Structures are given as structure tokens and as C-alpha cells.
Amino acid sequence: MAVYLLAVAILFCIQGWPSGTVQGQAMSFMEVYERSVCQTREMLVSILDEYPSEVAHLFRPSCVTVLRCGGCCTDESLTCTATGKRSVGREIMRVDPRKGTSKIEVMQFTEHTECECRPRSTVNNGKRKKNPKEGEPRAKFPLV
């Protein structure tokens, strides 16, 4: 048994731990960079966040995995934005607690297919932000 554990430890030292790094060493800059860039990645989304009008039902599971844009851009003035989308189906159990019934059905979710870093000033939930007119204050605060 001790020989087996020693062999496994040596193998991990040579090949790296499952996380992709040798124990005690930092992840390389290139690996950190590649994992953090703006790209589609698997994310959990709440079914009720996607279907807010469905509050009368319970869903199992209560969230699903879909590809969504996420990650860092090279400049703080940019944000990772979806430039391509598609609809995907997921089998979900819908429970009606009032009737005591349940059924499995396919629900549609938006999945991102392409991402791009875009200026924050033009992205606001898919709508362009209104720029203040010249001479107009940027923010209006109530007088106290």
C-alpha cells in the first residue's frame, strides 16, 4: 500500500495535481489568462429567474446549466457581451403543489454561442444607454 501511495505521489509531482498545477506551485500566467478571458462558459441559471411568471410551480432541478458569456476584458471600460445566441431545451420536472401533480417537460433557455468585449457605455441589458446632453448634469440627486 505504501508503495502505491508513493507511486501516486510521484506521478502527481511529474504530471501535476488534478487542478492542473503541482501542489505548492502557482498556476501559470498563461493558464490563468486563458481561463479568465471573455468566452462562453457553463453557468447555472435559476429557472425562476428565466421564467419569473411561473411562481405557482416548483421545478426540479431548480436551476439548469447553459453556456453564457463571462470573463474579463482587457480594459475596465469593456464588458463581456453575448454576440450570438440560440435556444436550447432542458428536461425539467414541473411540480404543481396545489394539485399534487408533476410532469417532465422540455423548457427552453437562451444559451450564448459567441462573446465579445464591448464598451460598457453602449451595453445596458441589450439597450443603448442614453448619453446626457451637453450642459446637462450627469446625475440628478434629490435635494435634502
UniProtKB/Swiss-Prot annotation:
Q: Name one Pfam family in it.
A: PDGF
List GO molecular-function terms, semicolon-separated.
chemoattractant activity; growth factor activity; toxin activity; vascular endothelial growth factor receptor binding
* Tissue-wise expression: Expressed by the venom gland.
GO BP? induction of positive chemotaxis; positive regulation of angiogenesis; positive regulation of endothelial cell proliferation; positive regulation of mast cell chemotaxis; response to hypoxia; sprouting angiogenesis; vascular endothelial growth factor receptor signaling pathway; vascular endothelial growth factor signaling pathway
Q: Which UniProt keywords apply?
A: Disulfide bond, Growth factor, Pyrrolidone carboxylic acid, Secreted, Signal, Toxin
A GO cellular component annotation here is: extracellular space
Enumerate the InterPro entries for this protein.
Cystine-knot_cytokine (IPR029034), PD_growth_factor_CS (IPR023581), PDGF/VEGF_dom (IPR000072), PDGF/VEGF_growth_factor (IPR050507)
For this UniProt entry, what is the primary localization, expressed as one broad class? secreted
Q: Where is this region: Disordered?
A: 119-144
User: Where are the Pyrrolidone carboxylic acid modifications?
Assistant: Q25
Member of which family?
Belongs to the PDGF/VEGF growth factor family. Snake venom VEGF subfamily.
What does the record note on quaternary structure? Homodimer; disulfide-linked. Interacts with VEGF receptor-1 (FLT1) with a high affinity, whereas it binds to VEGF receptor-2 (KDR) with a low affinity. Does not bind VEGF receptor-3 (FLT4).
Q: What is this protein called?
A: Snake venom vascular endothelial growth factor toxin cratrin
Q: What is the lineage of its organism?
A: Eukaryota, Metazoa, Chordata, Craniata, Vertebrata
